[in-house]
């Protein structure tokens, strides 16, 4: 079995110069000292895994480099990982119903943006919870969410980092609200709330860019009202767009990487799994796959 250290050594561990403050390669002396202190603290508590710079700095950034708050967050995450069975999720969980679920709630990764990030697309406006819950459960959907997060961390990011030539830590997300109604939004609220909790608490600082497209009338106004109460760094990553979103997406995502349905040129044949199931990106390209191996799939076509 390949060790965590071998995998870390196989791809870049430093973000580009000028990246967000507090990321690997973009630390001031105080942040450097906090990182060292944080690692020593966790080692003294018996932790041996997930102590690399990138991981520890994400927890520190999420808690504004407050050592005690970062420690609590890290400990809660490790406790949750053990209880949820995260370390063996690839062996234990198989989402064979995914091809059917994708028809009622499309969620998928597709290629990369201009900064080398994996592009994650979720078509929330297409959700049909009534049909979906005939073939799966919210519990299994959340298991799949964690499965995808782990694939993102263990396979997608290393491959994207090798291709980019620097450390890629985040995703570029497109959330499509086309066709969403109050009733469908209310239906999926419970899942979205739980999914958000998992992302914020256990996979912090993974959002690079977030595009909310086909936003209903008034959504942008509401967001502007809440902006003063949100973290400025978070706000800088979020873009609320209506139906004329194509130019904005193409500024961040190359046309050849953006699906045709969103204004790009990328098309995928059904033989390859179609847009929803093909999972195309550097993590499927042999030259960028390292000792971790190719990203697994939770289902068989």
Swiss-Prot record:
Gene3D superfamilies recorded: CRAL-TRIO lipid binding domain (3.40.525.10), N-terminal domain of phosphatidylinositol transfer protein sec14p (1.10.8.20)
Q: How does it sit in the membrane?
A: Peripheral membrane protein
Which Pfam families does this UniProt record tie to the protein? CRAL_TRIO (PF00650), CRAL_TRIO_N (PF03765)
Question: Which protein, by its recorded name, is this?
Answer: SEC14 cytosolic factor
GO biological process, any: protein transport
Query: What functional role does this protein have?
Result: Required for transport of secretory proteins from the Golgi complex. Catalyzes the transfer of phosphatidylinositol and phosphatidylcholine between membranes in vitro.
**CDD domains this protein is in?**
SEC14
Check the record and name the PROSITE patterns matching this protein: CRAL_TRIO
Gene source species: Kluyveromyces lactis (strain ATCC 8585 / CBS 2359 / DSM 70799 / NBRC 1267 / NRRL Y-1140 / WM37) (Yeast)
Q: Where is the composition biased (Polar residues)?
A: 16-28
Q: Which UniProt keywords apply?
A: Golgi apparatus, Membrane, Protein transport, Transport
Q: Where in the cell is it found?
A: Golgi apparatus membrane
Q: Which residue stretches belong to region Disordered?
A: 9-28
Domain of life assignment: Eukaryota
Q: Where is each CRAL-TRIO domain found?
A: 97-270
């Amino acid at each position: 079995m390949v060790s965590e250290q071998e995998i870390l050594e196989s791809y870049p561990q430093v973000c580009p110069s000028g990246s967000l403050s507090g990321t690997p390669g973009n630390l001031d002396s105080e942040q450097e000292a906090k990182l060292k202190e944080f690692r020593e603290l966790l080692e003294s508590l018996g932790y041996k895994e997930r102590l690399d710079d990138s991981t520890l700095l994400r927890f520190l950034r999420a808690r504004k480099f407050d050592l005690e708050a970062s420690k609590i967050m890290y400990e809660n995450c490790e406790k949750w990982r053990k209880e949820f069975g995260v370390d063996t999720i690839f062996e234990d969980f198989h989402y064979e119903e995914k091809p059917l679920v994708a028809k009622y709630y499309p969620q998928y990764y597709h290629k990369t943006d201009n900064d080398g990030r994996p592009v994650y697309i979720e078509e929330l406006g297409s959700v049909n919870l009534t049909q979906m819950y005939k073939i799966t459960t919210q519990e299994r959907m959340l298991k799949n969410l964690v499965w995808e997060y782990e694939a993102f961390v263990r396979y997608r990011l290393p491959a994207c980092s090798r291709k980019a030539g620097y450390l890629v830590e985040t995703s570029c997300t497109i959330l499509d609200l086309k066709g969403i109604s109050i009733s469908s939004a209310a239906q999926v609220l419970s899942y979205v709330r739980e999914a958000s909790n998992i992302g914020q608490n256990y996979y912090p600082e993974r959002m690079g860019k977030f595009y909310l497209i086909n936003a209903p009338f008034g959504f942008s106004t509401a967001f502007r009202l809440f902006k003063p109460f949100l973290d400025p760094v978070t706000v800088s990553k979020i873009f609320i767009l209506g139906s004329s979103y194509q130019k904005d997406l193409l500024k961040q995502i190359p046309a050849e990487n953006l699906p045709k349905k969103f204004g790009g040129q990328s098309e995928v044949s059904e033989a390859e799994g179609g847009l929803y199931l093909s999972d195309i990106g550097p993590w499927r390209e042999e030259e960028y796959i390292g000792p971790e191996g190719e990203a697994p799939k939770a289902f068989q076509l």
